[in-house]
Amino acid sequence: MQQIKMEEKLKQARFALMTMFEVLEKDIIQMKSRKQKKVYARMFYNYYLWEKHKVPHVHIKNYIEGMHHATSIYLKNKLETEMKQYDSVAMEWQTFLFFADYQDWKQQSSIKEMQTKYII
């Protein structure tokens, strides 16, 4: 059950990245291109796997075909540095998180609405 939920979340995350960076799903899950938009989409996906789903760098290759663990570590560090340096990258990350976890956010907000509506 847990694995199914994770795969659904990853699919939603990939869809958000496809929309944000105007790339195909295969561009996110395969290391076949070094075009900027595709690299950024993979960088966000790599960081999302590591940060939100606690996937170790050595297992990232199971989610992004052809990615070596050293590349995963490099991309994680690069994204963290860019988020500290550039507000636009940090804002893109926040936007991505919102859309990647939209269903959870929507469910959480409806719970809060119910609590405020029925609890004094």
Q: Which residue stretches match the model-derived regions?
A:
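Short Lys/Arg-enriched helix C-cap and helix-to-coil transition segments
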Residues: 83-110
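Short, amphipathic alpha-helical "recognition" segments used to contact nucleic acids or chromatin
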Residues: 39-55
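DNA major-groove recognition helix of helix-turn-helix
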Residues: 50, 75-76, 83
